[in-house]
C-alpha cells in the first residue's frame, strides 16, 4: 500500500472511530454541545470549513482514480485470462485489480463517512438545542400549572368566604339602603322647608319693598304739604305787618 492510500485508510479508521464515539448512548447530546461550544472551534471555524472542502475534493479525486484503475485492470484481466501464454502476468494483473478495488472501497467509504460525520455533528447540535428548549418549555409549563392551581385554590377560598359571609353582607346592605332612604326623605323634607322659607322671605321682602315705596311717597307728600303750609304762614305774617 502506497503512502497516500495508507493515509486514506488511516483517515477512514479515524472516521469510523469518531462515528462510534458519537453514537455512544451514555454521552448525552448536551455534553457534545458543550464540547462543540469551546472557543477553540470558533477560532478555527474558517480553517475548518476550508479543510472540509479540501478533503472532499481530495477524496473525490482518489475515488475517481480508483474507479479508473478498476476499469483498466478489469479489461486487462479479461484479456489475459483468455490468454495462456503468460500465466505470471495474469496473477500480477489480478493483484493490481484487487488493490484498485481495495482503494476504491477505501476512498468511497472515506468520502461517505466524511459527509456522514459532518451531518452527524449538525444533528447532534440541533438535538442538543431542541432538548434544551424542551427543558425550558417543560419548566415554564410546570410553573404555569403551579400558578394556575394556586389561583384556583385562592378562588375557591374566596368563594367559600363569600358564601359564608353572604347573608351578613345582605343584611348590612339592606340596613344601609334603608338608612339611605330615610336620609333621602329627611333631606327632601328639609329642602321643602327651606324652599318654603325662601319663598316666604322673598314675599316679605317684596311686601317690605312695597311698604317702603308707599312710605317714601307719603313722606314726599308730607314734605310738599309742609312746604306749602310754610309758604302760607310767611304770606300771612307779611300781610299783618
Swiss-Prot record:
Main localization, broad class: endoplasmic reticulum
Claim: Membrane is one of the keywords in the record: yes
Annotated region (Disordered), positions in chain: 198-223
Pfam families given in the database record: Bap31, Bap31_Bap29_C
Record has NAD as a keyword: no
Taxonomic superkingdom: Eukaryota
Swiss-Prot/TrEMBL keywords: Apoptosis, Coiled coil, Endoplasmic reticulum, ER-Golgi transport, Membrane, Protein transport, Transmembrane, Transmembrane helix, Transport
Subcellular location: Endoplasmic reticulum membrane
Single biological process term from Gene Ontology: protein localization to endoplasmic reticulum exit site
InterPro entries registered for this protein in UniProt: BAP29/BAP31, BAP29/BAP31_N, Bap31/Bap29_C
Transmembrane spans: 7-27, 44-64, 104-124
Membrane topology, as annotated: Multi-pass membrane protein
Coiled coil: 166-233
Cytoplasmic side: 28-43, 125-241
Lumenal compartment spans: 1-6, 65-103
Chain positions of motif Di-lysine motif: 238-241
GO CC annotation terms, alphabetical: endoplasmic reticulum membrane; membrane
Biased composition (Basic and acidic residues): 206-223
Biological role stated in the UniProt entry: May play a role in anterograde transport of membrane proteins from the endoplasmic reticulum to the Golgi. May be involved in CASP8-mediated apoptosis.
Quaternary assembly: Homodimer. Heterodimer with BCAP31. Binds CASP8 (isoform 9) as a complex containing BCAP31, BCAP29, BCL2 and/or BCL2L1. Interacts with VAMP3, VAMP1 and membrane IgD immunoglobulins. May interact with ACTG1 and non-muscle myosin II.
Family listed: Belongs to the BCAP29/BCAP31 family.
PANTHER family: B-CELL RECEPTOR-ASSOCIATED PROTEIN 29, BCR-ASSOCIATED PROTEIN, BAP
Name recorded for this polypeptide: B-cell receptor-associated protein 29
Taxonomic source organism: Homo sapiens
Originating gene: BCAP29
Amino acid at each position: 500500500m502506497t503512502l497516500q492510500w495508507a493515509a486514506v485508510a488511516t483517515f477512514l479508521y479515524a472516521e469510523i472511530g469518531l462515528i462510534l464515539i458519537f453514537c455512544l448512548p451514555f454521552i448525552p447530546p448536551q455534553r457534545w454541545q458543550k464540547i462543540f461550544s469551546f472557543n477553540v472551534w470558533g477560532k478555527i471555524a474558517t480553517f475548518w470549513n476550508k479543510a472540509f472542502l479540501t478533503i472532499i475534493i481530495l477524496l473525490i479525486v482518489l475515488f475517481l482514480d480508483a474507479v479508473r484503475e478498476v476499469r483498466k485492470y478489469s479489461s486487462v484481466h479479461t484479456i489475459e485470462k483468455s490468454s495462456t501464454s503468460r500465466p505470471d502476468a495474469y496473477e500480477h494483473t489480478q493483484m493490481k485489480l484487487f488493490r484498485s478495488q481495495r482503494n476504491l472501497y477505501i476512498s468511497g467509504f472515506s468520502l461517505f463517512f466524511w459527509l456522514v460525520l459532518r451531518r452527524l455533528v449538525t444533528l447532534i447540535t440541533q438535538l442538543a438545542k431542541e432538548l434544551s428548549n424542551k427543558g425550558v418549555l417543560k419548566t415554564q409549563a410546570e410553573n404555569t400549572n403551579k400558578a394556575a392551581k394556586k389561583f384556583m385554590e385562592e378562588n375557591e377560598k374566596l368563594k367559600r368566604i363569600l358564601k359564608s359571609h353572604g347573608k351578613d353582607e345582605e343584611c348590612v346592605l339592606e340596613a344601609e339602603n334603608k338608612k339611605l332612604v330615610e336620609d333621602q326623605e329627611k333631606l327632601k323634607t328639609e329642602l321643602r322647608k327651606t324652599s318654603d322659607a325662601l319663598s316666604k322671605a322673598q314675599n316679605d321682602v317684596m311686601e317690605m319693598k312695597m311698604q317702603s315705596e308707599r312710605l317714601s311717597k307719603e313722606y314726599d307728600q308730607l314734605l310738599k304739604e309742609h312746604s306749602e303750609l310754610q309758604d302760607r304762614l310767611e304770606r300771612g305774617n307779611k300781610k299783618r305787618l
